[in-house]
């Protein structure tokens, strides 16, 4: 007998509960958070023992949690060692609107 889609989903959830994953994918996790809640999230994720893939426009959040940056350039993805601050220093790229006069 083949499993239905719902049965497959339940099986995946059961497996995740039994053996928690050590990989998180977070897409704009600080959107709509106030400063206190954002800091709580940073502290909680700072203690996470695993890999995180973060997509965010929040430079403070990225600087607090990253230790490697993957820049997606068409045809030429680039990996930068170090966090967001080191990425800006090495690449010369800053967030739009943040350039000095």
Model-found features: residue ranges?
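ABC ATP-binding cassette signature C-motif
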Residues: 1-101
């Amino acid at each position: 007998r083949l499993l239905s889609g719902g049965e497959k989903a339940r099986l995946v959830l059961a497996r995740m509960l039994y053996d928690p994953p050590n990989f998180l994918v977070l897409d704009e996790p600080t959107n709509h958070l106030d400063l206190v809640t954002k800091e709580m999230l940073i502290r909680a994720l700072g203690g996470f023992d695993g890999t995180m893939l973060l997509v965010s426009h929040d430079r403070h959040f990225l600087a607090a949690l990253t230790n490697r940056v993957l820049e997606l350039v068409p045809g030429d993805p680039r990996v930068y060692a170090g966090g967001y601050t080191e990425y800006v220093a090495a690449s010369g790229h800053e967030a739009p609107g943040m350039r000095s006069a």
